[in-house]
Amino acid sequence: MSAMEKLRLGVNIDHVATLRNARGGALPDPVRAAVLAEQAGADGITAHLREDRRHIRDADIAAIMEAITIPLNFEMAATDEMQEIALGHLPHAACIVPERREERTTEGGLEVAGDDNRLAQYIAPLKDAGIRVSLFIAAERSQIEAAARIGAPVIELHTGAYCDYDAEGDVAARDAELARLIAGAKLGVELGLEVHMGHGLNYDTVAPIAALPEVAELNIGHFLIGESIFVGLEAAMTEMRARMDAAR
């Protein structure tokens, strides 16, 4: 991929739904957030329908798809229920993520290398339906190679550890994790995969990731929604977009 190619920004609106569900009502509406994100220049919207429905609800998916003209990236666990929902809605993309009920957010990458036969069979109907499948994985050679082996066209590399080390001020660990992400992105492209990255990115951590020519898309949610409380979603996205473009 050319280093001059525009880096896409996918905006995850899950935590608008988290705030809505804290009171059990209808507001703030994640569908409105998706529309505003599109108006502010998002290249796609990401929404994760978790098995416990802790933020996004079933009805939100159809409503978001009806309200936006940009692609929806539907995050989902590799369960029969979620496969049925994805095939019913036919979003542009489906990102398969690991899920544990006790976690606050997606804590690790999907285990592909040890579950490749099942996952190959699982993603086949999604691909056949025209859904672009991605796998949310750690930047580990075994996982990236397994993703390519089972026929997933896209991987999203987990940037959470890199961002956590940065927040803790552990420069050595942060830089080591960044090196892993760089190597993972290069390997992914070598294997014919489209490479995305996401999880925990903010204004301080986005530039080194955005600078990688192998990366086609970043998915950012929690930070943008949090920042929007203070400056508004459009301003938060504009600043993020500027930092991404400057790094490119």
Swiss-Prot record:
Enzyme class name: transferase
Gene Ontology BP annotations: pyridoxine biosynthetic process
Keywords tagged on the record: Cytoplasm, Pyridoxine biosynthesis, Transferase
GO cellular component, one term: cytosol
SUPFAM superfamilies associated with the record: Pyridoxine 5'-phosphate synthase (SSF63892)
Keyword Cytoplasm set for record: yes
Cystine pairs: none
Subcellular location: Cytoplasm
Active site: H48 (proton acceptor), E75 (proton acceptor), H199 (proton donor)
One Pfam family in the UniProt entry: PdxJ
Annotated site, Transition state stabilizer, chain positions: E156
Subcellular location, principal: cytoplasm
Catalytic reactions of this protein: 3-amino-2-oxopropyl phosphate + 1-deoxy-D-xylulose 5-phosphate = pyridoxine 5'-phosphate + phosphate + 2 H2O + H(+)
Biological or metabolic pathway of the protein: Cofactor biosynthesis; pyridoxine 5'-phosphate biosynthesis; pyridoxine 5'-phosphate from D-erythrose 4-phosphate: step 5/5
Job description of the protein: Catalyzes the complicated ring closure reaction between the two acyclic compounds 1-deoxy-D-xylulose-5-phosphate (DXP) and 3-amino-2-oxopropyl phosphate (1-amino-acetone-3-phosphate or AAP) to form pyridoxine 5'-phosphate (PNP) and inorganic phosphate.
Record note on quaternary structure: Homooctamer; tetramer of dimers.
NCBIfam families per record: pdxJ, PRK05265.1-2, PRK05265.1-3, PRK05265.1-5
Name of protein: Pyridoxine 5'-phosphate synthase
